[in-house]
Amino acid sequence: MSDTLNRLAEVLEERKQAAPDSSYVASLYHKGLNKILEKLGEESIETIIAAKDAATSKDYSDVIYETADLWFHSLVMLSALGQHPQAVLDELERRFGLSGHDEKAARQPSA
């Protein structure tokens, strides 16, 4: 899985330097973080709706498709912020073996 994420991260980085009319991702970067976040919000809602539909229909194709869009746009957001997908994988790895309640209790309150 990390090979796919690494390849995608490389492409996303390349698109930062591309002309806005050369690709969808380049156009998102050109429009700025707010547009990327707007798109991420849209994809979140679409994923939720697809999951609700899948729960009753037992057809999971749309929820898989929408989840891929959500992950993709999350990676675009991280890239726009100068972060690599490996940071998320590292955080998930850190959480293995840690109770969700313990992890939440260990967080520092934000100021």
From Swiss-Prot:
Catalytic reaction(s) noted: 1-(5-phospho-beta-D-ribosyl)-ATP + H2O = 1-(5-phospho-beta-D-ribosyl)-5'-AMP + diphosphate + H(+)
Give the record's keywords alphabetically.
Answer: Amino-acid biosynthesis, ATP-binding, Cytoplasm, Histidine biosynthesis, Hydrolase, Nucleotide-binding
The EC category is hydrolase
- Enzyme Commission number(s) from the entry: 3.6.1.31
What's a GO biological-process term for it? L-histidine biosynthetic process
* Superkingdom per UniProt: Bacteria
Which pathway does the UniProt entry assign to this protein?
Amino-acid biosynthesis; L-histidine biosynthesis; L-histidine from 5-phospho-alpha-D-ribose 1-diphosphate: step 2/9
Indicate where this protein is primarily found: cytoplasm
- Is Hydrolase included in the keywords of this UniProt record? yes
> What subcellular locations does the record give?
Cytoplasm
GO cellular component entries: cytoplasm
Keyword Hydrolase, does the record have it? yes
- Record-level Gene Ontology MF annotations: ATP binding; phosphoribosyl-ATP diphosphatase activity
Q: Which family does it belong to?
A: Belongs to the PRA-PH family.
What HAMAP family does this protein map onto? Answer: HisE
PANTHER family with a match to the protein in the record? HISTIDINE BIOSYNTHESIS BIFUNCTIONAL PROTEIN (PTHR42945), HISTIDINE BIOSYNTHESIS BIFUNCTIONAL PROTEIN HISIE (PTHR42945:SF9)
Name of the protein in its database record: Phosphoribosyl-ATP pyrophosphatase
